[in-house]
Structures are given as structure tokens and as C-alpha cells.
Amino acid sequence: MSDSEYLTRAEAALAAIERALDDTDADIELERSGNVLTLEFENRSKIIVNLQPPMSEIWIAAKAGGFHFRFVDGEWRDTRSGTEFFAALSEYATQQAGEPVHFEA
């Protein structure tokens, strides 16, 4: 994947997260600084989603751990488990919010 393809796909993922948070009733604050999204929950815990252009990856840091995602076969997939990005982010956010939170592309 070229650098421009990576950036287009990765930016689309960040935009999908922003849209989902606009539509949710969960109390999650969103801050964007460049290629980094910070989701802060009511309990003050955070999830950090950041782009890693040199690696062509998206990284998530959550209470559950650190995870790297690479674009494979049309989806962002965890480089270790193969879990789809939005499914994983939904799970981590649900755990930290204490209520269902859903993200999708």
C-alpha cells in the first residue's frame, strides 16, 4: 500500500470514530491532535488511537493493552490476533465506559 493509500484509509478510520462518538449517548470526550485521537471516559480512563505512517499501522492503547492494526484484505486487522479494528475498539470502549459503545467503518 502506498503512503497516500495508507493515509486515506487511516484518516477514514479516525473520521468513523469521530462520527460514532457524535452519535453515541455514552459520556466519552474526544480530543484530536494531528494523527492522535484521545477518548476520555467518565471514569477518567483513556483510549489513545494513533496513526503510525512509517509502519502503515493504526495503534490503540487501552486498559486492555497496546494493539497494532494493519490494513489486510479490505479491513484493519490486529497484527497478532487478526481481530477487526472497529470490533476491537468497540470492545475496549465498552469495557472502559461500562456501557455498550459501538464503532464501525
UniProtKB/Swiss-Prot annotation:
Gene3D superfamilies: Frataxin/CyaY. SUPFAM superfamilies: Frataxin/Nqo15-like. Involved in iron-sulfur (Fe-S) cluster assembly. May act as a regulator of Fe-S biogenesis. SMART domains: Frataxin_Cyay. HAMAP family: CyaY. The keyword Oxidoreductase does not apply. One of its GO terms (molecular function) is ferric iron binding. Signal peptide: none annotated. GO terms for cellular component: cytosol. This is Iron-sulfur cluster assembly protein CyaY. Keywords: Iron, Metal-binding. Belongs to the frataxin family. GO terms for biological process: iron-sulfur cluster assembly.
